[in-house]
């Protein structure tokens, strides 16, 4: 039974070196090669775009924990019971986190569900929690967006009545375009965590909750 059809053109050579050893298949058919997909495929999350930020969906995090448990059990069978116990504990914590997030995002006004950001890394967040990626402008040193791109993004903000524009935590200081756009459109700016942690959000759950509370605060909704 075919679950996901993977085209042969995605088969790529695995780079030499020990750092990539884990990618090498033991099967003789594709030894030294690996299927390089556009994004991680977990369950129904198939967006057709490059988005490695699977952790922005708690169900994806749960799937990752199970993969880690299985890998540890395979490498260390004597610890199987301990890995299973710890996994069960983590799963309960993730279920509680997921419930909190759904409560916060579920209370958002419709317009606040449209995200305009500096980082196209929130598609799993959007698909899991009922949000929509309305637009983004990457904070890149390689060049500024064109006038047409800026005008199009501003129309998006105005037409959808987007209450805020979100900057990425790691590139907030390099996001003058969106900061200026927010000022012109007279909407708020918020800062979201993408792939970093800090003293305010040193752990996964705190990072996820911080993003949810930021979006709720910028929308004018109470995050509890």
Question: Where does each model-flagged region fall?
Answer:
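Extracytoplasmic metal-acquisition and chelation regions
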Residues: 1-224
């Amino acid at each position: 039974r075919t679950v996901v059809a993977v085209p042969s053109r995605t088969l790529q050579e695995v780079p030499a070196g020990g750092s990539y050893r884990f990618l090498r298949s033991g099967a003789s058919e594709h030894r030294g090669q690996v299927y390089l997909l556009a994004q991680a495929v977990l369950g129904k999350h198939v967006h057709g775009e490059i988005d490695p930020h699977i952790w922005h969906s708690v169900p994806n995090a749960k799937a990752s924990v199970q993969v880690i448990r299985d890998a540890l059990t395979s490498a260390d069978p004597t610890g199987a019971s301990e890995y299973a116990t710890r996994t069960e504990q983590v799963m309960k914590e993730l279920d509680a986190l997921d419930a909190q997030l759904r409560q916060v995002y579920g209370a958002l006004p419709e317009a606040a569900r449209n995200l305009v950001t500096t980082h196209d890394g929130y598609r799993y967040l959007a698909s899991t929690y009922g949000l929509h990626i309305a637009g983004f402008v990457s904070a890149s040193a390689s060049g500024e967006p064109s006038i047409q791109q800026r005008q199009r993004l501003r129309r998006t903000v105005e037409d959808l009545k987007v209450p805020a524009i979100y900057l990425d935590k790691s590139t907030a200081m390099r996001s003058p375009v969106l900061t200026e756009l927010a000022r012109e459109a007279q909407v708020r700016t918020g800062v979201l965590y993408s792939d970093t942690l800090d003293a305010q959000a040193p752990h996964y759950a705190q990072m996820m909750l911080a993003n949810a509370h930021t979006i709720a605060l910028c929308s004018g909704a109470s995050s509890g």
